[in-house]
Amino acid sequence: MNVERLRFDDVGLALDLQVGDSAGRAALALSAAVGPQALKNTQLVSAWLKFFDEGKTITQAAQTLLDTGAMAALAGGADNASFVQLLYRNVIGQPASAATTEILLQYLDGGGLSRADLFRAVAELPVNQARIDLVGLQKTGLEYAL
């Protein structure tokens, strides 16, 4: 038996929290975009779960955030440097150094990597998995609003 979700009277619990599963992708992407504290917002988690339950990828989530301007609003600017700083701050927990920013900007500005692809790569990093305690979430589940 493979149970992905549990529903209680007041809250749901997502259990499909492997990196490739819907809830796993939602948790990693939400943390990269908004920060790990966003996983405590059950309404936000619910919206992201619905997106990924439709079979969408982290790259598609990033592209949606970019296309709607939500990523620029979160980053405080639409430029590549603001985007890099947002991801680094949310995943690592501190601003990126000038050297790190420059390296990542070379990939983005040179066309070697799209923003959506960089977002996916960063969201799936082991450091992001550790920052949100994905292993712990796999044991307890991720709460979401019904």
Where are these regions (language model features)?
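Substrate/cofactor-recognition hotspot
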Residues: R5-L146
